[in-house]
Amino acid sequence: MKQSLLLSFVLLLLSSSSLVTPIHARNKSNPAKSPVGAPAPGPSSSDCSTVIYSMMDCLGYLGVGSNETKPEKSCCTGIETVLQYNPQCICAGLVSAGEMGIELNSTRALATPKACKLSIAPPHCGIITSGATTPGASPVSPSAGAPTTSPSAAKSPETSATSPSSDETPSMTAPSPSSSGTNILSVPALTIVFVIVSSVAYISAFSN
């Protein structure tokens, strides 16, 4: 009778301890999600360097003040090569030409695919700077607005560079889910072992 009572009591304790196990399993099955990657930026002039020189034959047609009425066949072939690689490389080519001091008619450059009767649509380059201009437009000097810079505007990069919010936030990490599951199991397990040992000692002393 006493042995059966002891066995029933031990089985009851073991069954109650099994209720804690799913909590640990649920905590362990929820790993931290990886952050979503930022979208890739558009192609730069260095990415388009393999095809950007295909437009060299178009310089005579695209130059500011050019008298040519239509692009040459070699120019159309080069434009088609650039469009097949990446249409945005035309924009990169206009910017690169401006950086080298070559003034091009950006409006005519974007209309060249249509003039060459190509089926690929030209890109939307927006406002082209760095020397690529339309007829009658003069390039804007980058130093023109320098004297109007206020002292507060000059100090703003230093203030943003010393801000701790953007640099220190990524270093904060959330606690591992597995460690919380271990803490949940440790206290009930020790309690069960203590109760079992105490019960066996009590029943053994009572039977003697």
Swiss-Prot record:
Question: InterPro entries from the entry?
Answer: Bifun_inhib/LTP/seed_sf (IPR036312), Bifunc_inhib/LTP/seed_store (IPR016140), LTSS (IPR043325), Plant_nsLTP (IPR000528)
Task: Enumerate the propeptide ranges.
Answer: 180-208
* Coiled-coil residue windows: none
| GO MF, any single term | lipid binding
Can you quote a single GO CC term? side of membrane
Provide the phenotype resulting from gene inactivation: Some early aborted shrunken and deformed seeds, with abnormal hair-like outgrowths, and infertile ovules, and increased salt permeability in seeds associated with an increase in unsubstituted fatty acids but a decrease in omega-hydroxy fatty acids in seed coats.
Source species, domain of life: Eukaryota
Q: List the membrane topology term(s).
A: Lipid-anchor; GPI-anchor
Question: What does UniProt give as the signal peptide span?
Answer: 1-25
Give TM regions. Answer: none
Q: What PANTHER family does its record include?
A: BIFUNCTIONAL INHIBITOR/LIPID-TRANSFER PROTEIN/SEED STORAGE 2S ALBUMIN SUPERFAMILY PROTEIN-RELATED
Family from the record: Belongs to the plant LTP family.
What protein does this entry describe? Non-specific lipid transfer protein GPI-anchored 4
- What is the organism field in this record? Arabidopsis thaliana
